[in-house]
A protein has these predicted regions:
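Glycine-rich beta-strand-centered segment in the early N-terminal region that forms part
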Residues: 21-38, 50-91
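NAD(P)H dinucleotide-binding glycine-rich loop of Rossmann-like/cofactor-binding domains
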Residues: 36, 45, 83-146
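Short, glycine/polar-rich helix-capping loops at beta-to-alpha or helix-loop-helix junctions
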Residues: 92-95, 171-178, 243-248
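Mid-domain Rossmann-like dinucleotide-binding core that forms the NAD(H)/NADP(H) cofactor-binding site
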Residues: 119, 123-192
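Glycine-rich phosphate-binding loop and adjacent beta-alpha segment
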Residues: 170, 218-289, 322-323
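Short amphipathic alpha-helix with an adjacent loop that forms part of the alpha/beta core around
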Residues: 194-205
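C-terminal capping/lid region of NAD(P)-dependent oxidoreductase domains
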Residues: 282, 287-296, 304-323
């Protein structure tokens, strides 16, 4: 089978497209013929050896796919030929991937594969952050940092479903235009306004109830200063490469909670709640509440380009590769 293989940790251009053996499955696994695989910022970090978890080469990156079950182990009840969304630990950037039966979600055959491969990481993380970490309530205000990225765009769409008002922060006009097309309520440019003062103005002096922060760096403290009393700052990642050093006295005087969001670990410790959330996300798509259309669709041969765009901060919206 064709696969994207990391043979040496480093820049994405070191990745190789190789012919390798199909993975073998154990009694609790399914073999999925991959149609589409989602691409995310952590994939770029993983091949560099800079992610929270370091994997020794050689390995196949990629941990969200949509495809068809071609084979299954004896302990698997899902029928052959079922379309599924899968969340493999690694191995997704390939024509076939073996996944534990507990990490696949059956969907209807007419479920769009592009949407299926886009759903797990970005929408799963955002929904977990808003629903379970922030306990977001309809009518609350939400500041989305890095609003044009995969997490940001998923958050904007889910905020609409959950009845939240969004303030979307971006770094360029083309990103602002894309965010507006997704239904962002208010859009601001980091480089053109004072973040704290602008957010205060947009919330009648109160500040925002919730901040989604996949960016990090100095903007994190600016966002914290823009929160309302008893607000919540949700830390999802550090896309700009800088882990912020925040003045903790702000949490005292503002009563703000700084909450970590590691969706991947939560899926392992809370499988039943994960399944519940996925069922809800799939229903949002099937009912038309969520319209997931990846902005960037690459060929598998161009995976390294897709990952480089994350590192260069050129990525807008959700990225997938068609296998």
């Amino acid at each position: 089978m064709k696969a994207v293989v990391c043979t040496k940790l480093g820049e994405p251009n070191l990745l190789e497209i190789k012919e390798v053996d199909k993975p073998t499955i154990n009694k609790d696994e399914v073999l999925i013929k991959v149609e589409v695989a989602g691409v995310n910022f952590p994939d770029a970090l993983l091949v560099q050896g800079k992610y929270q978890i370091v994997i020794d080469p050689p390995f196949i990156p990629g941990n969200e796919v949509c495809g068809i079950i071609e084979d299954k182990g004896e302990n698997v009840d899902i029928p052959l030929g079922t379309k599924v969304i899968g969340i493999p630990p690694i191995g997704g950037f390939a024509e076939f991937v073996a996944i534990n039966k507990n990490l696949v979600i059956p969907v209807n055959m007419n479920f769009d594969s592009l949407a299926g491969a886009s759903l797990p990481i970005n929408y799963g993380t955002s929904y977990y952050a808003l629903k379970r970490r922030a306990n977001a309530q309809s009518g609350e205000s939400l500041l989305v940092l890095g609003a044009s990225g995969g997490i940001g765009t998923a958050t904007i769409q889910l905020a609409k479903v959950m009845g939240l008002k969004t303030i979307c922060a971006v770094g360029s006009d083309d990103k602002a235009e894309y965010v507006k097309s997704l239904g962002g309520d208010e859009i601001l440019r980091y480089d053109q306004v004072d973040l704290k003062e602008t957010v205060k103005e947009l919330t009648d002096g109160k500040g925002v109830d919730i901040v989604i922060d996949p960016v990090g760096g100095e903007v994190s403290e600016q966002a914290l200063r823009a929160t309302a009393f008893n607000g919540r700052l949700l830390v999802i990642g550090f896309a700009n490469g800088e882990i912020p050093k925040i003045s903790l006295n702000l949490t005292l005087v503002k009563g703000v909670s700084i909450v970590g969001v590691w969706w991947g670990r939560w899926t392992n410790t809370s499988p039943h709640e994960t399944a519940e959330d996925f069922s809800e996300l799939v229903s949002f798509v099937e009912s038309g509440k969520l319209n997931i259309v990846p902005k960037n669709n690459y060929k598998i041969e161009d995976t390294s380009i897709a990952l480089e765009n994350f590192l260069n901060r050129k990525n807008i919206g959700k990225t997938v590769i068609s296998v």
